[in-house]
């Protein structure tokens, strides 16, 4: 929070500021299901991380040249082995089942599409009236078990048994209407997952 305040106190020294937010800004102690950016002022996170992200998201709206990109989950090639999709591949290669501790509905967004959104903003922030707070999510919503199914439907992937310890839990997803309205040519979930598989080793 102090870092953000330091940056905005020097806004006169640069043209635009991009910040990254988390779905935790909506309070992970509550249900977060296809939540709209407009709900940020109605949520009060209980931990320091979520609260700081929430306060920054509110502050962003006071400035015309500050933009806030919110991620709920992110994936991309070269990610560490414990990440969800890479661990699916590694467990399958080792003939090990993959354990889902809580089968929540969750949004994941590819790093390639993060870069595409950022480039769109860099090229258009001073030409168009762009949303200053935006969820980076795809329209389709999946639970973790179904996301594993999407991943294993990619040609060449090898499926592994999935063990679900708890069949449901609080959702962690955002509304993607603002992003869809921008009509950016995104690669999407399936193509992004195929890229992760292609660069698995």
Describe the role of every protein-language-model region.
Residues 1-2:
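NAD(P)H-binding glycine-rich loop region in Rossmannoid oxidoreductase-like domains
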Residues 7-16, 56-66:
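A structural motif corresponding to the C-terminal end of an alpha-helix
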Residues 18-19, 67-69, 134, 187:
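Hydrophobic/aromatic beta-strand patches that form the interior of the parallel beta-sheet core
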Residues 28-31, 78, 110, 145-147:
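Short glycine-/acidic-enriched loop or helix-start segments at secondary-structure transitions
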Residues 48-52:
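Active-site helix of classical SDR
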Residues 100-201:
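C-terminal substrate-binding subdomain of Rossmann-fold SDR/epimerase-dehydratase oxidoreductases
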């Amino acid at each position: 929070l102090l870092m953000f305040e330091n940056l905005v106190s020097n806004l006169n020294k640069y043209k635009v500021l991009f910040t990254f937010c988390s779905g935790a800004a909506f309070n992970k102690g509550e249900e977060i299901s296809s939540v709209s950016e407009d709900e940020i002022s109605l949520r009060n996170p209980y931990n320091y991380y979520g609260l700081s992200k929430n306060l920054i998201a509110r502050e962003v709206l006071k400035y015309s040249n500050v933009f806030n990109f919110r991620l709920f989950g992110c994936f991309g090639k070269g990610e560490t082995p414990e990440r969800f999709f890479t661990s699916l591949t590694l467990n399958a290669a080792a003939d090990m089942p993959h354990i889902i501790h809580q089968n929540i509905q969750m949004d994941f967004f590819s790093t390639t599409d993060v870069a595409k959104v950022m480039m769109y903003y860099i090229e258009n922030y001073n030409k168009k009236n762009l949303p200053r707070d935006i969820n980076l999510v795809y329209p389709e919503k999946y639970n973790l078990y179904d996301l594993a199914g999407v991943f294993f439907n990619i040609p060449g992937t090898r499926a592994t048994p999935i063990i679900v310890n708890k069949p449901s839990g609080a959702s962690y997803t955002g509304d993607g209407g603002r992003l869809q309205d921008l009509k950016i040519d995104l690669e999407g979930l399936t193509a992004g997952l195929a890229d992760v598989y292609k660069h698995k080793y």
